[in-house]
Amino acid sequence: MPTKLTTTISKIASLPNSTNSALINEFHQYMKSNGASERHQNNNLKAVIAFANFLGTDTTFLDVQLKEQIMSFLDTKIKNVQEDPDKKWITTWNDYLHRIKHFFSGFTIRKM
């Protein structure tokens, strides 16, 4: 069963970094004001929340300057051949990449 948007939004407050929480809330408002569908909002928020959890308490989105920081997160989505013989993980990897790029290029750059 897919996660509802309200459930995803409630997870923002429990992130380990308050700066990232605030940026994700602003990103959500940005998507709403641009008329994004709830499904699009939900999927983007889930990806960005997962990345924020990966960054932990000491790193904010504003501190992310190297592509290697994003790549190390994306590489957690890679599965070995025994787990995923059809290499379906590539779709997940690309989906997260697209959503994180959207977050950084479409929204965060305007904030900086």
Map each language-model feature to its residues.
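Intrinsically disordered, low-complexity and often Lys/Arg-enriched segments
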Residues: 1-5
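Charged interaction scaffolds used for protein-protein
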Residues: 6-13, 20
